């Protein structure tokens, strides 16, 4: 049994990115779909598609690379873990690399970026940093 599916998802992205794979597939869940959509909207991945397989589904993530095949994602870090949850108040939402990266935060209004959380004045659980 997997104890932290979000960490597994981020690790699969990190590993595929390191060996410059074009895409990767992960078992789907609602929170993974939300995280993948955030990565797409923020320009870290090229595309995300959901494949219905009459079970839990599969998320296919298409990785993005710059010219000369340079990585767009230079780092991914899981912050709030099952053994040590990390919560922030609305006035303490972190900035990643002075705004060059993003923090993915699970709030009462869903999974959003640190910029959206600051704009909506929401706190929540800091899931991961991406830069």
Swiss-Prot record:
UniProt KW Repeat keyword: no
Protein name in UniProt: Small ribosomal subunit protein uS8
GO cellular component labels: ribonucleoprotein complex; ribosome
Molecular function (Gene Ontology), one example: structural constituent of ribosome
Keyword terms of this UniProt record: Ribonucleoprotein, Ribosomal protein, RNA-binding, rRNA-binding
PANTHER family listed in its UniProt record: 40S RIBOSOMAL PROTEIN S15A (PTHR11758)
Subunit-level organization: Part of the 30S ribosomal subunit. Contacts proteins S5 and S12.
GO biological process entries: translation
Family that this chain belongs to: Belongs to the universal ribosomal protein uS8 family.
Presence of the UniProt keyword Cytoplasm in the record: no
Pfam families, sorted: Ribosomal_S8
Described function: One of the primary rRNA binding proteins, it binds directly to 16S rRNA central domain where it helps coordinate assembly of the platform of the 30S subunit.
């Amino acid at each position: 049994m997997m104890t932290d599916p979000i960490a597994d998802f981020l690790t699969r992205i990190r590993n595929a990115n390191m060996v410059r794979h074009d895409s990767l597939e992960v078992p789907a869940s609602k929170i993974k779909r939300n995280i993948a959509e955030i990565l797409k909207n923020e320009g870290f991945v090229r595309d995300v598609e959901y494949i219905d397989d009459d079970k839990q589904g599969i998320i296919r993530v298409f990785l993005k690379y710059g010219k000369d095949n340079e990585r767009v994602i230079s780092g991914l870090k899981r912050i709030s873990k099952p053994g040590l949850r990390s919560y922030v108040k609305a006035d303490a939402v972190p900035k990643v690399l002075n705004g060059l990266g993003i923090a993915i935060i699970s709030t009462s209004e869903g999974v959003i970026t640190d910029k959206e959380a600051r704009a909506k004045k929401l706190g929540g659980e800091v899931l991961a940093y991406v830069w």
